[in-house]
């Protein structure tokens, strides 16, 4: 004669299943997030190669930064430069008047990865927009002093350009209200970079003046 499960047995089974789910779900999420970051770092590496190829064809000069204070362009500020499209290195993206290299940031749906280079800056209509600057910690990258030094001349800046993804847990709503905190050392200062300990921060690839590329992809 066959007997069904008793209530106690069912409760034990449910408890075991719940325990297994509690253990496995965070691990699955972590694995998925790690895979996503691997893809992003790989794409930033590829964009870095495209920038170097562009510079080789243009007497060592890199594409200008693009930014715009108009509402229709704010979320696309510092989008990947259209020069990489014109040179055939990256696919074309266009939203309204904003034209850029289309490789979507996996952490910022509908927007490309960001690019900031010390030197000339233009708006999305092609008009000069002054010089793009970066505030870089004194001693970077060997160490980060308390003082931030403003650079707007690529010939003296220790950083040539910075590529970045918004990374996990970035406050997207803040981008609708204000610009990135450049005056605080963003995106160069390592305190803004992704940290495995906190699980948040931007994913970066930065070219130093000596040609070396560093970034959050080096984090263990």
What feature does the model see in each segment?
Residues 2-29:
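N-terminal single-pass transmembrane signal-anchor helix
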Residues 16, 32, 36, 151:
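Conserved aromatic-histidine-acidic binding/catalytic patches
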Residues 17, 25, 33, 42, ...:
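A short linear-motif detector with a strong N-terminal bias
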Residues 22, 28-78:
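Conserved hydrophobic/amphipathic alpha-helical signal-anchor segments
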Residues 60-220:
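Low-complexity, acidic interaction segments enriched in glycine
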């Amino acid at each position: 004669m066959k007997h069904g499960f008793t209530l106690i047995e069912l409760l034990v089974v449910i408890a075991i299943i719940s325990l297994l789910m509690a253990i496995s779900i965070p691990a699955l999420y972590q694995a998925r997030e790690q895979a996503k970051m691997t893809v992003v770092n790989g794409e930033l590496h590829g964009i870095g190669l495209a920038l170097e190829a562009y510079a080789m064809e243009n007497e060592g000069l890199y594409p200008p930064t693009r930014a715009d204070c108009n509402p229709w362009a704010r979320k696309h500020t510092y989008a990947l430069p259209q020069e990489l499209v014109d040179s055939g290195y990256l696919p074309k993206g266009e939203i309204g008047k904003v034209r850029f290299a289309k490789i979507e940031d996996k952490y910022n749906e509908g927007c490309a990865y960001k690019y900031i280079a010390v030197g000339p800056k233009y708006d999305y209509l092609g008009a000069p927009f002054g010089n793009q600057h970066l505030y870089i910690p004194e001693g970077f990258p060997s160490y980060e002093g308390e003082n931030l030094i403003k650079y707007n001349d690529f010939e003296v800046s220790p950083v040539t350009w910075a590529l970045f993804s918004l990374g996990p847990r970035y406050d997207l709503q803040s981008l609708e209200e204000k610009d990135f905190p450049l005056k605080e050392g963003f995106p160069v200062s390592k305190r803004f970079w992704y940290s495995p300990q906190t699980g948040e921060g931007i994913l970066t690839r930065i070219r130093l003046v000596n040609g070396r590329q560093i970034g959050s992809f080096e984090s263990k």
